[in-house]
Amino acid sequence: MNKILFLIPAYSFKKLLKHIDLKLLRSYWIGFALSLTTLTSVAQNKVFTGGASYYAKSFEGRKTANGELYSNYDMTCASRTLRFHTFLKVTNLKNKLVTIVRVNDRGPYAKNRIIDLTEQAARIIGSYKHGITKVKLEIVQPPENTDSLEKYFMQEQVIDAEGKVVNPTGYTISIWRTRDFDHALLLTKYLQQEEYIQSFYVGKKYQNGRPLYHILVLNISTQEEAVKLKDFWERKGFMRVRMLEKF
């Protein structure tokens, strides 16, 4: 099975954040491609507030406006006007919980709503089964040169962001998976900026001949610890967390 992994070390992020203005942050790891721009909006007029709803379970498998098949387990959304493949940082203004979603559908058309979220995204921000939730939306840009980055990592089976070969050991937790490489990078970057003690990897496998990108926590020493981490991420709202003996 072909696969690739890379790591964005938490300690490196913390050092950078202490010394660099986040609004100007544009750091390139060992010159080969990963542009780490901050997840703030790119312009003042690209911040929106309004009501968020979520899709009913019955939409599973239906075609979205851009031709994809809708999945309750993905982190996509419907917007009336934003371009397809726009990435949005969604913040629940009541509890400040955040996730990153991608526009792939049109709607909602009710006046009091500006976005429809998947069940997965709604669970993560704590809005599932809470009706219309007031949210802030910020357009965020994926890292630059991701095509070059993906090709670079295809040269090695397992690699970290400093260009070193990684040999994972122990148990692995797959938090979430997506077909979209940019989406995996953005969500990994957001998680790494949080106060979690884990380091996050993006792993690539092929499923039915197409790449599938997993956000991973690696090198978990015991099954007991892995079970606890799986439970932790499920309580965070992730619906398909998997514990693996090896990725």
Regions found by a protein language model. Name each.
Residues R179-F247:
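Extracytoplasmic
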Residues I4-W29:
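Bacterial N-terminal signal peptides that target proteins for export
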Residues V42-T172, R177-L186, Y190, D231, ...:
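Secreted/periplasmic proteins
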